[in-house]
């Protein structure tokens, strides 16, 4: 056991930080899992892979979120991992990376759409009474890095 170096503390300087990062990289799973956090929920309408979802307060079922409705409808509760029909279970991804049927521009920030339920847009809503709900950043042309924030009501 005297030869085991893994348990020794890292130096509190730049080489120590580099050692920490190298060890961290060496212990990461391969491939890295991007769909980190999600949950199963029943849908009350048809949803398409990548749709932004909200949870209906009356029964907890999920459907397409939209920024021009109520606070509940503008509060994104996750993104549909797959396409399902009404009454079926869908996995809602709340953290990580999710494929979408939309064409995205890598690196751009996205917001919940006020005109198309379930969709995301680069330009946030700007009309009084609508909500601005930041939802994430495009990883590439068809995947969104999920970073859901609370909706902000425009006045």
Where are these predicted regions, by residue range?
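A signal for long, low-complexity, Ser/Thr/Asn-enriched, surface-exposed stalk/shaft
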Residues: 14-29
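Glycine-anchored, exposed beta-strand/edge motif detector
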Residues: 2-9, 29-155
């Amino acid at each position: 056991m005297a030869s085991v170096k893994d348990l020794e503390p890292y130096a509190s300087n730049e080489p120590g930080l580099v050692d920490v990062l190298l060890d961290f990289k060496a212990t990461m799973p391969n491939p890295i899992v991007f769909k980190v956090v999600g949950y199963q929920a029943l849908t009350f309408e048809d949803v398409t892979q990548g749709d932004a979802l909200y949870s209906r307060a009356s029964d907890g079922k999920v459907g397409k979120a939209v920024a021009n409705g109520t606070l509940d409808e503008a509060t994104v509760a996750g993104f549909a991992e797959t396409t399902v029909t009404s009454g079926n279970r869908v996995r809602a991804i709340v953290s990580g990376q999710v494929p979408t049927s939309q064409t995205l521009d890598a690196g751009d920030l996205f917001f919940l759409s006020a005109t198309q339920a379930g969709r995301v847009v680069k330009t946030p809503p700007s009309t009084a009474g609508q909500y601005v709900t930041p939802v994430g950043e495009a990883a590439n042309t068809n995947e969104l890095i999920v970073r859901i924030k609370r909706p902000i009501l425009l006045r």
